[in-house]
Amino acid sequence: MQSDVTPRDEKLHVGIIMDGNGRWATRRGLSRVRGHEAGVEAIRRIVEAAPKQGIGTLTLYAFSTDNWRRPKAEVAALMTLLRFYLANEVQSLVRNGVRLNVIGRRDRLPEGIATAITRAEEATARGSTLHLRIAVDYSARDAILNAAAKAAALTSLTREAFSQLVTGEAGLRDVDLIIRTSGEKRLSDFLLWEGAYAELHFTERMWPEFDASDLAAALASFHGRERRFGGLQAIMPEEVPSLSRV
């Protein structure tokens, strides 16, 4: 049986739905693109803070399959930012021991970005301080559906094997905590399989504002919770009623 409380020395898997870039910018009279640029700065802050706060795997929701519906100019700007991040952050990631993986579809990304992703993944493959996963053109339901299609050809299947089909990785730790910024309270098709028992933390802070202290607050809340994984809290012997007293 899994422990009710996650040990603080155990490396966590945290997912973050990075929401609120556009609203942050609009409230300041700035373009939505400027909000996304500020969001990249927040990514840098949190990637630096995560290992120091006990996070071993960090999955960031950058672009969902539904985000293609946004205005073309905004989508183009987001793809430019992704290209810029891949080109300019790799050396910093390598220097800090960060291993990068990009999850989601790659066949619909603009020309050159898929190649840049592969190069960044190869360059950071030896990183062991933090496993950074960035979800781009990602849908958890599509990931599960694709895994089910592959599993249909198998004669036997375990939960661990199916999990590898969903995530594309063997031995990936289930998500411990999902954080969503901007005050919205929904998962938006993010990590539905690997986050089945994840704790949820919602904050009013917009993503460009989110910093190490906000991450620490979310983790403090997480560590104060009892995680029962579908079971019951352990009952002490003295709490069990005696038949003689019934």
Which residues does each PLM region occupy?
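Flexible, compositionally biased loop and terminal segments
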Residues: 1-246
